[in-house]
Amino acid sequence: MSLVAIGINHKTATVDLREKVAFSPDKIHDAMKSLASRTRSGEAVIVSTCNRTELYCNNGDEADIIEWLEEYHGLDHQDVAPCLYNYHGQAAVKHLMRVASGLDSLILGEPQILGQVKQAFVKAKEAGTVALTIDRLFQNTFSVAKKVRTETEIGAAAVSVAFAAVSMAKHIFSSLSTTKVLLIGAGETIELVAKHLKDNGVASMVVANRTLERAQSMCEEFNATAITLAQIPDFLPKADIVISSTASPLPILGKGMVEKALKQRRHQPMLLVDIAVPRDIEPEVADLDDAFLYTVDDLHSIIEQNKASRKEAAEQAELITEEQSYLFMDWVRSLESVDSIREYRSQSMAIKDELVERALNKLAQGGDTEQVLIELANRLTNRLIHAPTQALTVASRQGDLNTLGQLRTALGLDKN
């Protein structure tokens, strides 16, 4: 068993590269099946969010997995390789546990990543790329993330990218009581944004979504107005703040649409926060006067303040993930020991069966019983002690006293 984790995130790559290696929801099922086919166990999970893309595989070759990622997205090795990180064995286990616990997030301790990891695991199960080891790994990871939440203060005053976006809006507008907000998307992140906006007394909210029913369902809770994406041009001129987070592969707001809206607003300033990957708002919008565009990469100052306040809780959480990752590896080793014992017994039984059959044939042909039994005993002894004798000889010749001692203990040579 060899667990491998390979990824790219907000710490190692720009939003431009991150959006190139992201997997869209409608393609991730087939992507997981394709990735799993490159492993010896057929086990693989892809975690793809706006801030990270990570591949978790059991019994996969690191170079082969990286090659698959580059081929899948049509990217050059020299562009991707410097931004990748990789973990093996216990380090891979700990990394996943840290990710799910929010310890590796853009905003330390944010809870949304756990839901995203769970969703990735569900999709992998649907794709048939989960077996014993990966299943146990992710189930344990979810338990560890819960343990971190309940036993530390990492989740106190819970924050997220959504919280950071609203904090930035408050910083720029000082008060949100007179501002009108257009939210694009109706997923978990936008729902959190709406919650924070409501808590801060925003004047009004409009939610635009591809599926009107989903937007309407969300709007009931926040007393907001639901519209379709096609209606955005009609509502954009009224928006002081635009916050967007969808899974659209193409930008939803273009420079021309925003420019037209600003003219209708008589050039009153508009704050646009794009927290989607790939981006929902064309980067050229930032060139417009009175349009202030920010992406997830612009939220670092808020994030750094958050990290400082949660440092102590994070240290406690790190200890939990460290301990639990070792416990998981103990379970993995127990599986390996069971396999080894099974193989050893099977091998010994095969030798016995072979030699017994040979002895019975000789007896059937009239061989002397005593001579046949002595030959059977000698042959069985020689076959069974051959491998241990070779191992003892090599360890002794190399002066490897540690291995020699372990072999003597295993063979019962040091018993009184």
Swiss-Prot record:
Residues marked Important for activity (site): H95
NCBIfam families: hemA (TIGR01035)
Matching HAMAP family: Glu_tRNA_reductase (MF_00087)
Organism encoding this protein: Shewanella sp. (strain MR-7)
Record bears the keyword Glycosyltransferase: no
Residues reported to bind substrate: T49, C50, N51, R52, S105, E110, P111, Q112, Q116
The protein's name in its UniProt record: Glutamyl-tRNA reductase
Family named by the database record: Belongs to the glutamyl-tRNA reductase family.
Keywords linked to the UniProt accession: NADP, Oxidoreductase, Porphyrin biosynthesis
Oligomer and partners: Homodimer.
Misc. remarks from the entry: During catalysis, the active site Cys acts as a nucleophile attacking the alpha-carbonyl group of tRNA-bound glutamate with the formation of a thioester intermediate between enzyme and glutamate, and the concomitant release of tRNA(Glu). The thioester intermediate is finally reduced by direct hydride transfer from NADPH, to form the product GSA.
Record SUPFAM superfamilies: Glutamyl tRNA-reductase catalytic, N-terminal domain, Glutamyl tRNA-reductase dimerization domain, NAD(P)-binding Rossmann-fold domains
Domain notes: Possesses an unusual extended V-shaped dimeric structure with each monomer consisting of three distinct domains arranged along a curved 'spinal' alpha-helix. The N-terminal catalytic domain specifically recognizes the glutamate moiety of the substrate. The second domain is the NADPH-binding domain, and the third C-terminal domain is responsible for dimerization.
Role noted for this protein: Catalyzes the NADPH-dependent reduction of glutamyl-tRNA(Glu) to glutamate 1-semialdehyde (GSA).
